[in-house]
Curated annotation (Swiss-Prot):
GO terms for cellular component: ribonucleoprotein complex; ribosome. Keywords: Ribonucleoprotein, Ribosomal protein. It comes from the Bacteria. This is Large ribosomal subunit protein bL28. The keyword NAD does not apply. InterPro entries: Ribosomal_bL28 (IPR026569), Ribosomal_bL28/bL31-like_sf (IPR034704), Ribosomal_bL28_bact-type (IPR001383), Ribosomal_bL28_sf (IPR037147). GO terms for molecular function: structural constituent of ribosome. It comes from Synechococcus sp. (strain CC9311). The keyword Metal-binding does not apply. Belongs to the bacterial ribosomal protein bL28 family. One of its GO terms (biological process) is translation.
Amino acid sequence: MSRVCQLTGTRANNGMAVSHSHIRTKKLQQANLQQRRLWWAEGKRWINLRITTRALKTIQKKGLGAYARSLGINLAKL
């Protein structure tokens, strides 16, 4: 399974690790992904999602159905 958020599509970012002597090395910054089982009220069922903590925070604010609609995602297919 790839390390990609199923709702937002967030994936790893290429960055640089900079030491005290300013030597730069490439570094992969992974998304903070969590496996969650969320209740979808409109579908009256549980949905297993691998989502970022940022998406989880937005779901707590807006609700799963409303957030998925705003992203153009059909939860019935998940």
